Amino acid sequence: VIVDPVANPYRPGAGRRPPILAGREPLLAGFEVIQRRAEERGEGERSWVLNGLRGVGKTVLLTELLARASSAGWIAAKAEAGIEPLPLALSRSLVKAMRTATGRHPEGRLKRLLGVFKAFSLRVEPSGGFSLGVDVDPIAGIADSGRFADDLASLFEILGETARDLGTGVLILIDELQEATASELAAINVAIHNLGQADPPLPLSLVGAGLPSLPAQLAEATSYAERLYDYRSVGLLDEWASRDALVLPTRQLDVDWNADALALALETAHGYPYFLQAVGKHVWDHARRSPIDSDDVRLGLVEAQREVDDGLYRSRWERATPAQRDLMRALADLAGDTTASISEIAAAVGKPKTSHISVARNELIKKGLVYAPDRGLLAFTVPGMHDFIARQP
């Protein structure tokens, strides 16, 4: 079989859906249960928090959940925290979901929801910039107090009640949730806590995604957040899932990998989903016929490493100041892909006190280059960053 570059099945890049969501089957099966409980019983499950490093596929999973909910006729919206105030981002994403709902359901059954949402959105955007595509008057006194936590709780309640009446569900997805302010996180916690007190729980699910620091941030916003969510870690793929990510897309095109070639590719990618897609793409581009062999892999790995270096690591490295790079080098030497203590890092850069590196540490956290998995610890937000740093002059 000739390997055709035009038919390349791999899709490297931020947020791009790979051909196979390898290793994520348990999570998707869990969402299927949420869907069925909402549609068959009118009941909601606990909301989810997905946490993991950069490039492991959190955004891809949110997009997949959005597609599944939308195709099932749910009221589904996806927003991103940190770009604009969260009330504005949620309103903007919900407008599209409301417009879709008006095309699927009789307007009369949506009238109360649309009126409440109109009042909520006017509080967020007083100029009235959001158009629902239908004439609707705002309903005063429910979700328009101007207190985001109270208004969001009221809006979620109306959304859940409407969905139950329609025999469907609501899915709210928020990406980069670690970028939300403490008050925005507290508002989300309050709204979800309020939903869970209904008996039976209303069929609205929120799925937030963010860095591994997100669970601690939610708990700092309100202490009960530790028990509020179903926390799911999205990590590196194990060997079998990594194998599926590389082999299944080519098998569908009658192209195989020989054993040595596959072993070399797997050993280099270390289960990192972003890198696996880059490896697959460049190996395919170098291959001429099936089966893919070790020479194809060796050539492809050079290009894949260059793509990941230039597209993922280099921009992060170049955003750091010299002092911040010193701290990153120390973290790379001490921890690799794990964690190091602030005291160890301070000693490694020749500082007698941890306070002497606190400015550089805080700036690196703000830039999203490192995070604090626990008090007094630091780790890189991107797998493999330590290897890139080791290759720098």
Task: State each model region's role.
Residues 2, 7, 54, 260, ...:
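C-terminal leucine-rich, beta-strand-based interaction scaffolds used for sensing/assembly
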